[in-house]
Amino acid sequence: KGNCYLGIDAGSTTTKVALAGEDGELLYSYYNNNNGSPLHAVVEALHEIDAQMPKTAKIVSSCSTGYGEHLVKAALNLDFGEVETIAHYYAAAFFDPDVDCILDIGGQDMKCIRIKNGVVDDVQLNEACSSGCGSFIETFAKSLNHSVQEFAKVALTAQNPIDLGSRCTVFMNSKVKQAQKEGATVGDISAGLAYSVIKNALYKVIKLTDPSDLGKHIVVQGGTFYNDAVLRSFERISGCHAVRPDIAGIMGAFGSALIARERYEDGMETSMLPLEEIFAMSVDTSMTRCKGCTNHCLLTINKFSNGRRYITGNRCERGIGKEPNAENIPNLYDYKLHRTFDYEPLSDEKATRGVIGIPRVLNIYENYPFWYTFLDR
């Protein structure tokens, strides 16, 4: 009953959806693998919301975040979009208003967000490699014929966790196979992997030297922390107590819903498409090379049945068909050219002391306005 606020976190491997009420209470949540199609997963969640939401309730504001933020926002015409760090902070602050450190481990990324005086002060991310994240554990669980839930459960009773360090996945894979040959149990391997995920986060991403540097109010989140073994590994390695919300995996979506709630103003009409249009919408995806310049960017063009489109892969605005705005954006190269060479030399009659040639090379080239003024005036 009343106003509802929709938050969508289109992640790299999973899609999360949250619906919040007027007081920030969680009314609905969705968490599932997107199988490479976050938009399809979002529509699936909206079908569930439509089936469960009474007529006395309505979605009045919406916000997206995550890897697919712009795609989902463009497809559904959502009201707002926000970067992941802010969305995660809003969610963490809802559970602990004094939070000063947020550790988020997702499917293919991990980040540490430090909060100072109520604002984001620093963000540390894993770099190009995604080893040691949630999909890393999932891959090993499947290779050992276990579900992720079973794999996490057996880790809690492991007697001799194997030491895998925090190296590259390729080397760790070899280490796991070697441990199996030496008789290590699945539980020992799972516990070792849980330790390695935390070691990677603390020592490779955050580059921690003293556990006290993490802060006094730590919130851990991300789907990987649904794994109790990972949470326990964090507590044992860092020696810190952390808050893990029971909705750790959908904190990005929940934070987006809270942002949608905060930015909503009485009487505001949502720009989000009606659910009937969303359910009837189709998407046509094609790829082409941009011919705007010599980069020849590979563009992915998503065309929606309602006429809108969303383009990715472009390195500049030419790729999305935007023309340069000559009225508002100055052409600095054109300005530099005219500023440098739009000087009229003295006539032969006035140049009584002869002619001096200024080479258009090196720093003399850019210093020509100085030399012209110095010699002429």
For the regions a protein language model found, what residue spans apply to each?
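Glycine-rich phosphate-binding loop plus the immediately following alpha-helix
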Residues: 34-39, 117-160, 249, 262, ...
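Adenine-nucleotide phosphate-binding core of ATP-dependent small-molecule kinases
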Residues: 174-203
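Short glycine-rich, Thr/Ser-proximal phosphate-binding strand/loop in the N-terminal lobe
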Residues: 8-40, 44-48, 123, 127-129
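Glycine-rich phosphate-binding loops at beta-strand->alpha-helix junctions
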Residues: 66-68, 196, 212-235, 248-249, ...
